Amino acid sequence: MCIRDSIYPTHGLGPLCMILGIGKTDHLAWLTSFATKAVGLRQHMSEDDTTPITLGDIISTQIETQGGTLISLTHDTTLPRPRSLDFEVQGSLGIWDGVNRRIYLEEMNSETWQDDHAILALYESREWQLWGEKALKHDSHHQGMDYIMLRCVAADLTETASADSAGSIRYPATLSDLALWTSVTLLSEISIREHRRVAFGYSSDLQYKKNKNL
């Protein structure tokens, strides 16, 4: 395994980019990645196996946006740990912990975490309102995520969302979005190898201005 980069950035980065309006009101600007030594995989290999392992056990990537937001990505799959996406969103008015399903908002006038279900229900997407119950039933492994995205693809391609919905549903990401998210893998490899901050390689100023009011 002669690789040394963040090999699976999209799982966490995709939802964060949608939340932050990346490609609409903001753009990814710079990336810096760090890697630990490679030990975890080696411990589970035969002593006779001389396959070189260069992928660090933990790859930490910090992404700066043009608007001043910081995105932190961690690839951590070769060391012992319980499964967790460690998904968290924090801003000037509060913080949401997606793993433990809890939230803290400054307006709550409390210094303790609160259960997030009641608050998130106020902001459920149209797609989840339409298909959320079926999604959880048929896609328990990924908590409905795969099901919802596939239904969005089908709705977009056929230009029909559902018999009980008004209007059509569009897939929430473009090919440009997908290319941008996966480019983190290549850019992180450069950052780790050359020990430096790396710019995202697209001319974003004009695009940012054009999309600023979307």
Model regions and ranges:
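Short, compositionally biased segments
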Residues: 1-6, 163
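Alpha-helical scaffold segments in carbohydrate-active enzymes
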Residues: 37, 95, 184-188
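Rossmann-like dinucleotide-binding domain that binds NAD(P)(H)
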Residues: 4-82, 88, 176-180
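Short, mixed charged/polar active-site loops
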Residues: 70-72, 95, 170, 197
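Stable alpha-helical structural segments in soluble proteins, enriched in small hydrophobic residues
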Residues: 141, 145-153, 181-195
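C-terminal capping/lid region of NAD(P)-dependent oxidoreductase domains
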Residues: 190-214
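C-terminal glycine/acidic-rich active-site capping loop/insertion
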Residues: 43-52, 56, 60, 64-65, ...
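Short linear motifs in exposed loops
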Residues: 74, 99-100, 201
